[in-house]
């Protein structure tokens, strides 16, 4: 990893990888920093069905690999590292990473969001021992077992449908009286004989049992009917939680955010700090989809290119947004 770039992109999901492609294609020295594996939450997708140009379902790994390959072909650099500090000094941004310092003229935040927890007893204690936030990662461990899915959005319904391929004992609970998921996604769940749906229901506690090796793992849950208040203990072997996300904004504590903590930008994806952009799941937007995130990445890279050209004194005629 070199030390000086035109654009540094933090995060390698659909938004970050698209920004990398457009930045590198503009002949700008572009670096993508990802702390784990490139792809972000795309990697959890078992079958992507609604991305334009892909009439047949494609899994998240293959989808990500195509994005990354295209960005590399245009010359983008990639690094596996953690960014611990980001600050602006003059016209440049300084970043401290686990692989050393880096500076850039523009930074695109594509840091995404992490899974929101239920906050109930037993959840943290049994993480990795039956409590999971990724069905494609951990679902195969619970083939033909009793599985509980929590949530009512697209993610919960998609993951429940995936888990129903592994077990005919899947229960989906949602605190409201109807799904928030897109109608087609929700209907797939309602039509699946392997999925039992319980509306107006929340999880109050996750209980442990000891396996033959003496290790505690998920054994049951306490469910509560939000209308009657009645509680019921139900035997379960796994709990998969999909109840929303928390934007990853710790690098920019003073940047403007909406009431939910997502970064606020203008239509060009730029924050109130010139040269600092936010795209994808970390950004305040009414509609979170991969195709939207990719579009945001392209817009941010285009605007970052203009920002850099201004700094260089090489301004081109802008096309109105």
Predicted regions and their residues:
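Glycine/small-residue-rich loop that forms an oxyanion/phosphate-binding "nest" at active or ligand-binding sites
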Residues: 78-140
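Phosphate-coordination loops involved in phosphoryl transfer and adenosine-cofactor binding
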Residues: 4-6, 80, 99, 143-145, ...
